[in-house]
Each structure stands twice: as C-alpha cells, then as structure tokens.
C-alpha cells in the first residue's frame, strides 16, 4: 500500500510507540487520526505530525468503550471517506504478585488490552472488508512469546492479541478477503514512558529490562508492514532471539526469564508506593515518545548468553555472547554487543 495520502488510525497515539508511529506516517505524507484519552497530548502530537508534512485529526477515546471506538471510526470516515490502516496500540499494565493484584485493576488491563483491540479490529474490519483492502496492525509484545512473572494480566493480554491476529487472518482467508491484512508486531523492551505509567503493587520500582530499543524502531516496522504485510514480526534482536530459543527449550527460557525479571525489571534499590497508575485516569502532561531508558543495554549480551546456555548449550551461549544467534531459518540474528 502506498503511504502518502493513506488514512491511518492510531490508538494510544498520545505517547510512546503510538506517538512515534503517528510521526513516522506523517513524515511520509499520511493522514493520521490520533486517538487516546488525553486530548491535550493528542493535540500536541497532531501539531508535530503537521510539522512533518502530514495531516492530523484528533479523536479522543477510551478503547475499552466500544461506542467511543465506533465514533472514532465514524469521524475518520466522515472526514476522509475511508480507513486504509488501523493500528491498535493503546495499552496499560499492572505489576503485582498474582494473588495481590486488585481484581478491578486486573480486569481493567484486560478490558483495554484485549477488548480494546477487539473493538478496534471490529470497527476497522467493517470498513476494510467492505472496500476489499486495508491493513490492521496489532501491537503485541515479546511477553506473548516468553511470558514473565508479576505482570500476569499484561502477559495474558498480549498472548490474546497474538491469537486474535492469527484467528482473524484465517477467517479473512476463508472469506476471500485477500486485500485485507492483519499483522501482529511483537516488540522487545521499548524506551517509552509505559513503565512509569503502569499500575504497581510490588513495592519495587518498575524499570525497563534491557536491552531497550527505540520506539522509532517499532514505528518503522509498522510503516514497513503497511507497504509489505507479514503475519507476525518481532522488533529488536532480543525478541527474535528469544523466539528462537523458546522453540528450542521453552522451559529453560521460562526459568531464566523469571530470574531476569526479578533482577532487572523490578528495582532492588528503589521502593515504590502502591498505585493504580494510568489504568483509570490518563497520565498528566503533553505526552512523550521516549521514557529515558535507552541507556540500559550494557548487560544485554550476558543475559542472552544465560538464556542461550540454558536453552541450547555452550555453542549457543558463545554465539549469544559474541552478538549473534541463528534464527529458525538459519540466518544470523544480531544482538547489541556489551561494552
């Protein structure tokens, strides 16, 4: 699909990956429709999009509310006459021991991260199926491939998003909608404000687990998928490597992932008060693309080597430590080198 003048709806566009994606499409001349709960942040993002050469429409919405998502689609079609691309990117998270997670908070994560994507998919596909073409992009996570502890609701939601994409692709194929594509993006840890905004009942500050990649990397992947759709793609060498290692020895990866979350995802130095984060009320401010985590890469090679050693033995560990891993198709996967 040609990007210039295409109509692109993006949920979660006020910050992080969603905002970076809006800017990437705008820079290529797309007409972007920005949605999230924070109108002021969306308006700031819209100004940035217009400065980069795109046209922007702001439609605030809580994706957990289907009527609001339907209104988002209606306003898009009313303004531009069609929907070419829909990016489901709005997401929230909850960190807590499973037994201590407030059930209302747990349910809210699933409402936003699962039902929000269902709402977006229904609204988008209604228009795309009628026109016979379009691209739906669902932003999932590395945790859909390698689940982690203390964020059960989030992990469940991202696994559901991956399954949603696979199920929709099969249905569209059976119905003969060859021009309508559903793509799932599974990023590794990304440098966004997501972790600062998360609900947290662990008593420990949540930090981004290295290696950390830029949100622009995810945005560029999404733009590429619109031009050349693929069913599922990972973003970041660590995500590709973990996917390969999980296929070799899922149990070993699971054990190492648990240790690394305890050591590198939840701070042992900085306590944190219990809070519901942005689950019910949007975070204050005009929104940021980056979260200030991009320096957390120095121990990446050592961590991957641990996973590789547990999953596949010495040869894989050496390859991981040196900065490369074989992919399932035999190609080499690069990895950020330690310093």
Describe the role of every protein-language-model region:
Residues 61-71, 103:
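The beta1-alpha1 cofactor-binding region of Rossmann-like NAD(H)/NADP(H)-dependent oxidoreductases
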Residues 298-324:
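Hydrophobic alpha-helical topogenic segments used for membrane insertion/localization
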Residues 174-268:
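SDR active-site lid
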Residues 7, 14-15:
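Conserved glycine-rich cofactor-binding loop
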């Amino acid at each position: 699909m040609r990007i210039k003048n295409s109509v692109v709806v993006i949920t979660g566009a006020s910050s992080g990956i969603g905002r970076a994606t809006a800017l990437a499409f705008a820079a290529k001349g797309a007409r972007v429709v920005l949605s999230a709960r924070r109108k002021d942040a969306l308006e700031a993002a819209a100004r940035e999009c217009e400065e980069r050469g795109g046209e922007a429409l702001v439609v605030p919405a809580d994706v957990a509310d289907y009527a609001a998502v339907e209104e988002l689609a209606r306003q898009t079609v009313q303004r531009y006459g069609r929907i070419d691309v829909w990016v489901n990117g709005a997401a929230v998270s909850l960190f807590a021991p499973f037994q201590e997670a407030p059930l209302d908070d747990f349910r809210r994560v699933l409402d936003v991260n699962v039902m929000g994507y269902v709402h977006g998919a229904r609204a988008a596909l209604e228009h795309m199926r009628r026109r016979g073409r379009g691209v739906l992009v669902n932003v999932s996570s590395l945790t859909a491939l390698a689940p982690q502890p203390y964020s059960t609701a989030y992990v469940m939601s991202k696994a559901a998003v991956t399954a949603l994409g696979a199920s929709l692709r099969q249905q569209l194929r059976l119905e003969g909608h060859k021009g309508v594509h559903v793509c799932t993006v599974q990023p590794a840890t990304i440098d966004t404000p997501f972790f600062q905004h998360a609900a947290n009942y662990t008593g420990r500050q949540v930090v981004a687990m290295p290696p950390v990649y830029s949100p622009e990397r995810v945005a560029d992947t999404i733009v590429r998928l619109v031009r050349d759709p693929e069913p599922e793609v990972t973003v970041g060498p660590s995500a590709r490597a973990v996917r390969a290692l999980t296929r070799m020895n899922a149990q070993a990866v699971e054990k190492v992932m648990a240790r690394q979350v305890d050591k590198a995802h939840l701070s042992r130095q900085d306590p944190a008060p219990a809070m519901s984060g942005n689950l019910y009320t949007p975070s204050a401010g005009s929104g940021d693309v980056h979260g200030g985590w991009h320096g957390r890469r120095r121990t990446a090679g050592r961590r991957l080597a641990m996973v590789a050693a547990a999953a596949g033995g010495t040869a894989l560990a050496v390859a991981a430590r040196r900065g490369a891993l074989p992919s399932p198709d035999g190609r080499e996967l690069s990895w950020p080198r330690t310093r």
